[in-house]
């Protein structure tokens, strides 16, 4: 995006508003923010532009996003977490060189087990079944929650808005609902 067109305060307020909306819309016991490439970009920016501020808690990404205030657990320096038995990754390590035509299939090819990832801003699902063990694995990638007409992605029309809702039971079994947002409606 052209830096002259940036409205950092407006973008920041939009981000906080989105976090509040998510918290109000979904009644779940705990929310997580998994540190990934976006947070790393903030760290690189601060190190290059304002290194003297790096030690101040006020300028940490978790304080800027008010994660404690919103009851969101910040997870840093961890490749993945699990919701029940389902591994959850951001995907920046798996999709380092792009996601290809079918991101969920590419995810499966990399992790070889059921998993859900974001990062590619595209909803997809791929299921595979082992002919040896009869085990079935499914991988999902989720859409994004940003504005649908971002300047940096004009080269692609494959991005879609979306998110996943994951239910788990006491045994760790899970159910994934990979939602898309199309024309303002959750589908």
Residue ranges of predicted features:
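Flexible, charged surface loops at secondary-structure boundaries
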Residues: 24-27, 68-69, 82-83, 107-111, ...
